[in-house]
From Swiss-Prot:
GO terms for biological process: mitochondrial translation. It comes from Caenorhabditis elegans. Component of the mitochondrial ribosome small subunit (28S) which comprises a 12S rRNA and about 30 distinct proteins. Its main location: mitochondrion. Belongs to the universal ribosomal protein uS15 family. Coiled coil: none annotated. SUPFAM superfamilies: S15/NS1 RNA-binding domain (SSF47060). This is Small ribosomal subunit protein uS15m. GO terms for cellular component: mitochondrial small ribosomal subunit. Keywords: Mitochondrion, Ribonucleoprotein, Ribosomal protein, Transit peptide. The lineage of its organism: Eukaryota, Metazoa, Ecdysozoa, Nematoda, Chromadorea. The gene is mrps-15. Transmembrane segments: none annotated.
Amino acid sequence: MINLRRFVHTSCRLERGRTAFYNVHQKVTDPAKQDPDYFEKKARELPLDQNYIDALTKLYYEKIGSERDLGLKAADNLILEKTEFGLPRIEKSKTRAKYEDLDVLSNAPESVKKIFSVEMATRKELSQEWKQSLIKSVRQHSLDENSLEMKIAWLTALIRHWSLLVNDIGQETKKKPTWLTHRIWLVINERRKALRILRERNETAFEKTIAALKISYHVPKQPAHVKTRKAWAEAQLKLRVENEKEKRLEELHEKYDKEVEEHKRETQEKRKALNNELDKLAQEMRQIDVIEGKSFETVGKYEPALISSLTETVIHSNLFYHPPPTMTEK
C-alpha cells in the first residue's frame, strides 16, 4: 500500500520569503530627509562596530521606503509645511479674478461683494486664484502667457493644490488616491524638465524663479547610481573606509607635526644649554692660563697708530718707489 505521508506536507511552518519586503509607502515626517544626500550622510555617521552591517541594512530599507513620499514632497518642502502646502495666502475679502473687471461691483453692497469674493469661491476657483498669484510673482510682463517661468509657476500651483487635496482625502480614508498621486508624479516630471531647460537657457531667471516659488532644486544624479541593497551597502562601506583612512592619516600627520615641533624646541634648548656650558668652561680655562702665566688678560682693544704709519708709508714711497718703464713719461 502506498504511504500518502510521503506526498503530503502536514507541517504549518512558515518559510521566509524569497524577496525582501520594502514598505514603499512610509510617511516621512523629518524635514531633514528632504536633503538628497541625507541617507549617505547618516551612513557615514554610523559607528563601526559589530552591528554596522545591520544598521546599514535598516538605513537602506528606510531610504527605499521614503523615496516615494520624498519624490512627491521634497522639491516643494511640503514635509516641513503642512498647513498651507506652500500655497500663497489670499485675502478672503478679495474679489475673484474673473469678476475683478466688473464695474457694477464697485458700488454694490457688502453682502453682494461677499458673494463674489474669495471666501465664497469653490475649490476650482480657489485653485485659479493660487495659480494667478504664483504666476504674477514670476512672469516677465502682464501679457506673458508662454514663458517657462509662467509654465513652472502654473505647474507648481497645480502640484501643491493636488498635494493639499491628497492630504484632505487621507484624513477621511486610509485608501490613498492613486488616481491623483499618479497625476502629481507626471506634473512633477514635467516641471523638472521645464526647470532644467530654464537653467540651461537663463541662469539668472532660473535662480529668481526657484527663489520666488520656494522650490528646492537639486541636480539629478546620473542614472548609473547603485540600486540594490548589497551594492549600496558596499558603496557606503567603501566611502566610510576611505573617510576613516583620510581622517586617521590627517590625525597622524598633525601628531607628527606636533612631535617635530616639540623635538625642535627640545633640541634648541639642549644646544643652547651645551653652548653656555662650553663658554663657561672656556672662560675657566683662560683664567687658569692667566694664573699660571701662560697668557695675559688684555684690557681694552689695541688700535695701531694710523697717522704715523701712514706718514711713514708715504715717505718710503717717495724715496724708494720706482715705477715700471711703461708708466714713465716720454
